[in-house]
Amino acid sequence: MQASEKTLNEIKAKLPYVEVKKDKLLSIVYVQKELLINTLKAIKEDFGFKLFLDHSVVDTLEAQNRFEAFYILYNVDTKERIAVKTRTEHSLPSAEKLWFAAKWAERECYDMFGINYEGHEHLVRAFMWDTYNYHPLRKDFPLQGYETVELPSLNETVFGDNLSNTMNYRRTHTYVPTLKDLEYTEKNRIKKKAQVVLNWGPLHPGTHGTMWFLFDLEGERIVQTDVILGQLHRGVEKLAEHEPYQQFLVYTDRMDYISALCSNQAWTVAVERLLGIEDIVPIKAKYIRTMMSELQRINSHLLWLGTYALDLGALTIFLYAFKEREKIMDIIEGITGARLTISYTRIGGVRMDLPEGALEVIESFIKFFPKELKDWEKILSRNRIWVKRNKNVGVLTKEDIYFYGLTGAVARGSGVFYDIRKLEPYDAYGMVEFDVPLGENGDCYDRYLVRIEEMKQSIRIIEQCVQKLKTMSPNEPFMAESQDPKKLRLTLDGIGLKVPVGEIYSSGENPRGELGFYINSKGGLKPYRVKIRPGSFYNLCVYPHLMENRYVADAVTILASLDPVVGEVDR
């Protein structure tokens, strides 16, 4: 929930130089940039907002202090969220000493907006290669980029200028990185301290995506690690500024493509909150969205478990997990019509009602799946090799969770109670019963146990949703209807949907942690700015810390326990 009026007044009393603002959607503290670090430190240490969630920038194109920067922080004791804002023309002080997660967020802002962070230890680009000359999220940067390089396609080369009058003819294109650019980027990221720098990725089965890791090795011990991101960067946040709210839904499918339904749901709920229409979304749609997201959560965890086990040599579990996962994929395909990129939710409901017989098929699955899960636990949980590879490996304390901005099963594996479904319930999560499993030691083994238990809790949630949906008539609405279509147009295609002026930070509990959306609306059909807070991005930022003084063999184990998806990391 947003920070209360009382909390904001206490901050104002302690820090009289700040301005505070409270509304239903966002609680904000405004401060001059010269006092930013002192303010962040006081809010963290004196008011308990220890968990770093996100930091980014809005380009307002104003003549002075063009960029509005914001920090999203969370108090795990009072369960309050707050935003700290400041303005700048081109530079800000770095907050990396307060939170390591800020270091990665600042690199992203430098990359996308050109903001210089004073005191940043190693300010390099986050997604683009280091010799790139532009900052794509600035408002004066065109959507298609600057087409300055002559790079004709094969057809244009063969037919020459005979194609010059056709719509597909383009003699110039945007610049793409050369091998020389990538070599420079690699050398700029890590300064060798030990014997040899080992490249892992960007295309390797163990990374489960196009992630590029650099290990500085002393024998088989890793002295330092760096991660080069951006191989799957597609400019999703830039695209969001040019798409209607409903049309942007298809891009959420393509971030964490393993759990597209959960991403759909998080975006839809964020826009509904900004519109103020949560109360008119049909109860049937809320239960359907919750049930489908929990099926997707199990689906995601099964993929994680199968590939995790395979990476450590347990082929049997990989085969068992994928057999059950295929059943869920068939259920999802039967209901939504797609297996991977689904786009099932709609602003105001869902795309279509459940087909006849869907609930019976789901009931059949959740009846037999718990037994399968129990059998897998017998195979893995006390297996000597599995325990040896996971116990006391990749240990994270509670303070690490706050410092690195970690969420999801990674945070809960260290005993931090942080689950958006419980803390800020959306859709039907406030109407169903389930427990939040917590670890004790914060190692890879605890993160494994937490995800196993999460699948059991997802079954509980699905059971309750199925029972509730069975009591509902097929004629009950699955899409909200506007009281005044002239002011608010709610349709399946989303055409004509206008969102009022305002801003919001709203998040959902994805299988990989908190998926947050900061939406800034100037009114109209399209958002002015969308900042996506992916759980995978921040969970990955702790990886270099966990790899210090570990063996190369631990690289796969620790990475798998964090469970990043590169589509969500790179966006």
UniProtKB/Swiss-Prot annotation:
Q: Which NCBIfam families match?
A: PRK06075.1
> What is this protein's name?
NADH-quinone oxidoreductase subunit C/D
This enzyme catalyses: a quinone + NADH + 5 H(+)(in) = a quinol + NAD(+) + 4 H(+)(out)
Q: Which of the seven top EC classes does this enzyme belong to?
A: translocase
| Highest taxon in the source lineage | Bacteria
Identify its membrane topology class. Peripheral membrane protein
Q: Principal localization?
A: membrane
Q: Sorted alphabetically, which Gene3D superfamilies does this protein's record hold?
A: Cytochrome-c3 Hydrogenase, chain B, NADH:ubiquinone oxidoreductase, 30kDa subunit
Q: Write the lineage as a comma-separated list.
A: Bacteria, Pseudomonadati, Aquificota, Aquificia, Aquificales
InterPro entries assigned to the protein according to its UniProt record, in alphabetical order: NADH_Q_OxRdtase_suD (IPR001135), NADH_quin_OxRdtase_su_C/D-like (IPR037232), NADH_UbQ_OxRdtase_30kDa_su (IPR001268), NDH-1_subunit_CD (IPR026662), NDH1_su_D/H (IPR022885), NiFe-Hase_large (IPR029014)
Keyword Nucleotide-binding annotated: no
Q: Where does this protein come from, organism-wise? A: Hydrogenobaculum sp. (strain Y04AAS1)
Q: Which GO terms describe its molecular function?
A: NAD binding; NADH dehydrogenase (ubiquinone) activity; NADH:ubiquinone reductase (non-electrogenic) activity; quinone binding
Q: Which SUPFAM superfamilies match?
A: HydB/Nqo4-like, Nqo5-like
Location(s), subcellular: Cell inner membrane
The segments labelled NADH dehydrogenase I subunit D in the record are 194-571
Which family would the database say this protein is a member of? In the N-terminal section; belongs to the complex I 30 kDa subunit family. In the C-terminal section; belongs to the complex I 49 kDa subunit family.
Q: What is its EC number?
A: 7.1.1.-
Q: Which UniProt keywords apply?
A: Cell inner membrane, Cell membrane, Membrane, Multifunctional enzyme, NAD, Quinone, Translocase, Transport, Ubiquinone
Q: Where is the signal peptide?
A: none
Q: Encoded by which gene?
A: nuoC
